[in-house]
Amino acid sequence: MAPNIRKSHPLLKIVNNSLIDLPSPSNISTWWNFGSLLGICLITPILTGVMLAMHYTADTSLAFSSVAHICRDVQYGWMIRNLHANGASFFFICIYLHIGRGFYYGSYLYKETWNTGIILLLTLMATAFVGYVLPWGQMSFWGATVITNLFSAIPYIGQTLVEWAWGGFSVDNPTLTRFFALHFLLPFLIAGISIVHLTFLHETGSNNPLGIVSHCDKIPFHPYFSMKDLLGFTLLSLPFLALAFFTPNLLGDPENFTPANPLVTPPHIKPEWYFLFAYAILRSIPNKLGGVLALAASVLILFTIPLLHKSKMRSMTFRPMSQILFWLLVANLFILTWVGSQPVEHPFIIIGQLASLSYFTILLFLFPITATLENKILYQY
């Protein structure tokens, strides 16, 4: 029998083992679609971004005009820009759902896969932040000023670090140039880390909704899950295209239609919606260094999740008390996101502080305590 090139060719063999003959648990649900959707969410901004970079000018006097030029004069420039900007929003929607699924079903016990995933999230956040600065509107400029200024809270080296990042004594032309360079580079770094992420995943195989070992019951990825992923991609592309074509500025800030002006501060400086939960946690602490530490902890706390797993069951499928806690955490994150978009005044200050406190309390204390209690109830006999 002639050898199958798909299984013998050095390069095709890798693709085959990752996407075609990959043994997958037969019972994984639609929640397992988001990994492949994230791949699509990465490819789309890279392709549109390369096309935008051909027309964009990374100079403070020309950046705003070059974005307007792309939207007005470049063939389908408006479409490329809208797909690129809203692609970031859908990237974050997918990654948050992907993390939520990993948390709910105990996938974090694959520690290497989980940790590389968090590194991917941090890299994505950095990419989105530097990208938001590039149109050089009011919110771009002031967002960059406020967020980079947070590094000055670091003792001893803070101020030097900020001036080094700025390339001067304020956010100016050198800052914009280096942010453009970073925004071009980081998505390719994300693509590289994604391969590492997948390599670790394929070492152990996928988790499943029951959280049990499924080696005895696996099916090939293609055609079963490739078809399922295709459906997921179709269902994701509908709201994505609807947003990009009908209401492309829905998730943006109106302030960004005004060119950057260092002499006029916007009434309410806020980041894009996907950072609002962390921004609310930052603002809830009246001390600068404390706020920065809380901001860092709000994301870095994910590294501690595998260490805080006390349950004898992996998944939350059969753990109703933990399920209630999980959905409380989700509701809490929605509250933080909403508070982050509101001005700093009563009652939003106290709501933000209570939501921030409950965020850390749920993750660090209530989940391990509940898991221990469930062990007692479930395994008492």
Curated annotation (Swiss-Prot):
Any one annotated GO CC term: respiratory chain complex III
Keyword terms, alphabetized: Electron transport, Heme, Iron, Membrane, Metal-binding, Mitochondrion, Mitochondrion inner membrane, Respiratory chain, Transmembrane, Transmembrane helix, Transport, Ubiquinone
InterPro entries named in the record: Cyt_b/b6_C, Cyt_b/b6_C_sf, Cyt_b/b6_N, Cytb/b6-like_sf, Cytochrome_b, Cytochrome_b_C_euk/bac, Cytochrome_b_N_euk/bac, Di-haem_cyt_TM
SUPFAM superfamilies in the record: a domain/subunit of cytochrome bc1 complex (Ubiquinol-cytochrome c reductase) (SSF81648), Transmembrane di-heme cytochromes (SSF81342)
Cofactor(s) demanded: heme b
Pfam families hit by this protein: Cytochrom_B_C, Cytochrome_B
Protein name as it appears in the record: Cytochrome b
Lineage, highest ranks first: Eukaryota, Metazoa, Chordata, Craniata, Vertebrata
